[in-house]
């Protein structure tokens, strides 16, 4: 029997690694009929901070975030010393919130309190919440989530769609189970005529050039087509544009004004990646999500939608689960499991929420690879808030 060559084995290992990253939300953005994210390259020009900024009693900036005081200073400061020394990669910020209060705020390297940091795939999570906001305002209903995407997109020529395309629901798109499969050669050819991908033409191209869509339940595949369809539905149902709706009714309601959000090839906001948020504003997303859609006494998103979005709808063999563009997995300390709900982005961007402890960890980074902070947070930070003896 002929043995596989070393090159074949290396390619197999790379394929396995990429598949694993795609199944936990940490893979680099893979574009087909989307514009590539440019925020990472833009931030390369930021000089590293000469000295880390570390606050164990963060300032009240009158931005809607309650502040408190870190009690377990020694252990946290020992860990942040390791971050500053580069022992955990290129970390840019670490914020901790406990019981709804920001108790620790720190910035390193390219991290800035007033500069939006690229988010990569957390943009998907924000897109899901924009759909939730549309439901809260009556532009959609919870029942609409189970309706076909094409039923909202009136410009789609349904006579040209591949078999099964009409059956893809909004809920399936937000759970990465559209079933759309476009090979790279076809995608490259379609990208040569970008004018045809403007507006709903982007979705027409996906649904017209995909392999036939199988009947549900379909296989989970982490890809750009599904959030693109979701953003197109938002554009179709809200007054004005999706961009204005996100600015006014989502970000504006949380006092988020200093942000970035790139346009996709469709001229709609990007959805698979492409947003930039300040670390404090990432925390706002976490606080609002942990509070089931409520922000400063106002119900911005239906609690039912938030629960569904952060639910374990699909669980992969690695034990990581996916809802509507939000992740969840179990963190372990000793013999106890703690459910962690999260937004995740390539390069090391995280909003990690531990409901049982009312704990939120916000992390930004510019890792060359994906970094190990997801596991490090479980091993180094979480135990400090589980054990009452840690100091």
Spell out what each predicted region is.
Residues 18-111, 137-141, 385-391:
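N-terminal leader/targeting segments and the immediately adjacent pre-domain N-terminus
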Residues 226-233, 273-295, 349-365:
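Active-site-proximal alpha-helical segments within enzyme catalytic domains
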Residues 137-180, 236-277:
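Active-site helix/loop module of the DD-peptidase/beta-lactamase fold
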Residues 21-34, 343-391:
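Structured C-terminal helix/loop/strand segments within mature extracytoplasmic catalytic/sensor domains
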Residues 100, 118-145, 230-234, 282-289:
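Active-site SXXK
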Residues 256-257, 307-362:
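Active-site Gly/Thr loop motif
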Residues 101-106, 148-150, 186-216, 240-259:
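Short, charged, amphipathic alpha-helices and their helix-cap/turn boundaries
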